[in-house]
Design a protein with these regions (language model features):
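Subtilisin-like serine protease catalytic core
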Residues: 1-32, 36-94, 108-111, 139-142
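Substrate-binding/access-modulating region of protease and related hydrolase catalytic domains
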Residues: 40, 60, 82-169
Length: 170
């Protein structure tokens, strides 16, 4: 684990000039709701796309499933930094929140940033230059950035001639 204890993440926060966010456990080493400006990341919905994806990626079994099997994520020893950028109330956000969360993740030493932002059909063409620049800064620091391109088919759905540079079109 990169952060062995709460003191390690607090030192990283101090070095990065970050005075917000909360340590929850050895697994969830940092959490902050950028939209609400609080440490409370509990979502109103019982099932959340971002939380679900996090479980697929970094889930490690605490209890056995009903069939007595244990379910693991693809990287069960990974530590998590939850950085929420969407409102729980109306599912809105702002590009400045994406940028701040990306920059903070890099400053705190993230190896991978997953942005579960998928919508019906979208692309980086729709992202503002500030978000694209933040992703480029992260990549320049060696951070892998993974962004959902859509959750409902390919970008090309509904477009007779989708842009060739959109890699999710097959």
């Amino acid at each position: 684990a990169k952060f062995k204890n709460q003191d390690d993440i607090e030192k990283a926060k101090k070095a990065a000039g970050i005075d917000y966010g909360k340590w929850y456990s050895d697994k969830v080493v940092y959490a902050y709701d950028y939209f609400d400006g609080t440490d409370n990341i509990k979502e109103a919905e019982k099932e959340s796309h971002g939380m679900h994806v996090t479980g697929i990626v970094a889930g490690n079994p605490v209890n056995k499933a009903p069939n007595s099997e244990k379910v693991y994520g693809v990287a069960p020893e990974a530590q998590i930094m939850f950085m929420r950028v969407f409102s729980d109330r109306d599912k809105t956000t702002a590009s400045a929140l994406y940028v701040k969360a990306i920059d903070d993740a890099v400053a705190l030493g993230a190896d991978v940033i997953n942005m579960s932002l998928g919508a019906g059909a979208g692309s980086t063409v729709d992202a503002g230059s500030d978000i694209i620049d933040a992703v480029k800064r992260a990549r320049a620091k060696g951070v892998s950035v993974v962004i959902a391109a859509g959750n409902s088919n390919t970008f090309g759905r509904g477009f007779s001639q989708p842009l060739a540079e959109n890699p999710d079109y097959g």
